[in-house]
Amino acid sequence: MLACSMSLLLSFFVNANSQINELKVGVLVQSPEIPSAVPDYLKPNEGEGLAGALQAAKDSNRTGKFLGLGINLNMAQLDDQQALISQAKEWMADGVQILLVDADTQALLALRKALPEELILINTGNREDSLRTETCLANTLHTAASFSMQTDALAQWLRSRRLSEVMLVKGDSESDKKYAEAVKASLKKFGHKLVAEKSWSFDTDLRRVAGKELQAFTQGPEYDLVWVADTRNLFGQLLPYNTFLPRPVVGTHGLEAGEWSQVIEAWGAVQMQNRFFKDNQRPMTARDYNAWIAIRALSEAMTKTRSTQGAELLAAMLHPGFYIAGYKGRKLSFRPWSGQLRQPVPLFNQQALVATAPFEGFLHPRNEMDTLGADRRESRCTLASQE
Amino acid sequence: MYLQSLQKLCLIALLLPGLSWAGQVYVSNEKDDTVSVIDLDSLEVVDTWLVGDRPRGIILSKDQKYLYICASESDTIQILDRATGQIVGELPSGEDPEQFILHPNGDWLYAANEDDALLTVIDIPGRKVITQIDVGLEPEGVGISPDGNTLIVTSETSNMAHWIDTRTNENIHNSLVDARPRDAKFTADGKQLWVSAEIGGTVSVFDANSREEIKKIHFSPKGVHADKVQPVGIRLTENGKYAFVALGPSNHVAIVDQQTLEVLDYLLVGRRVWQITMTPDEKMLFTTNGVSGDVSVIDVDRLKVIKSIKVGRFPWGVAIADE
């Protein structure tokens, strides 16, 4: 009798495994425009973002096979906005319901406009704050942290270290300007003082004269630190140790704030770092992580709902009880108003994890992680009606 | 005269702690590649043994003569002779063994291979691998029923407890639990299975027969943010009275009534408490506190923390021999 019931059970699981119900996901990455002045060692890796999605699909399908659920990925990296749109349309015709997108603001807006609303977008690369506060996109989640999440994390750290007088040095690209705006808002939010603001627009070759040029450039009033806004890696990497006053450098260089770095090893992260390195022969970057966590969130929603319907999955991900484990030591969830992934923001340099925001003492009535980035009252977006 | 020689004997015993056969506690120090030896009477560290890379899981052989140690980064399970503190052999473990458990027959060892999503079944006398079983991603906690017939392995990223029949080594059932399951323990009567979920912040209690969840236990030690309540190690007393649950970075151990499944109290221990083990007489409980690098000792009768003992860097596992 026992043997009989056992074999029945076994066959049940074999059956469940053989019929995999698949969710089709597209992953679109817009090739970044890299100025030739950027040193090679700071250029993005080939396939950044895509590799993270692939890793997550592998991870998730291991769980899924026990439940008869699977994720099927279509991936492309393209330059042109129009090419991105036609690729997305082609995939949609083939049954793709979810699209991960890493693209600039213009391309992201164009994609959302060109594609029907039932196609769910997950932004894995764009940090622009207005996409979370003003320009609210239909059925769109963001796993990339916004600029203000990054700058709030650093501004909290400044408080914890009693540093408050800031010299801001910014580049002249569009994203440098957006980042600098976020810096200024964070300084205000956390009670710091902007004592000087400088724009770096020079195009001299700094490699041999960085000390001389940058020291002269960072002269000015007394400051506790230099905050650099150089999202393209044109000069920021040369600022640490080259400021006129010997002060720390934070921002896009020096002490950075981001979703992920190879220096994160705690909370079980080392296992994923190893897994990723083994498959890709390079460390996992923030753009890989953002794609990874997007797929993991989908997989978790599939496990919860046992569904592969896009709309059901989106509703599940925005449900108040939904959370995912992301090797960050806390539950990650989506802000229901903007679709932004709530997450701790690690602060790190190239060699070590320095701290993790939110810091103790920054309280919030709902969730301490909401002290980072645009809170509900600072946003016009209302993606999900329920809290 | 007699007293004098007794004193001498004691002195010798103190000088040669490795040879003493009093009860001892063994703590694996993940980042020091050592095992700290604590004397059960004096509650002091009496020796530190160098072992393989990144020692984590640590258990005693059935005859209590040997310690088995998962040397995760050496990709092996080391056999350590308790009498000498020397490594006397190795068991094939598969890659990156983290936690393991001994079958009640004393001959079979089940090790979770975290990096490979496998469970390795090892024959100790033959020092060979019997088989490897495909499980979910990042397998971690392993538990075995008192009759030895049912083995549980939890997978941290798949959020599942896999039920394995040890007679066939087949995966017979999968139960979904909350995020990052870490430990699985059967009650002494074999009727219940307890599974902790670190990020979920819960312990799920299953009926071992129907494999249905009976209850999900939540924890809320005073003054601790809910996100920091991260259950890892579970210990169930054999008399069916208490369950102790290590709550990670909340720095507390929860005491749960095994009968009513209600939380009775919380005890403050060292920082980031993960694993717990009880003395065989169930009078003392030892917890490993990874961040503060110490071990807290809890008096089970009085339910009080009576001492903390400094050990190596990142203490992980703990095993106790009563003789």
PLM regions with names:
Chain A
Residues 2-11:
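Bacterial N-terminal signal peptides
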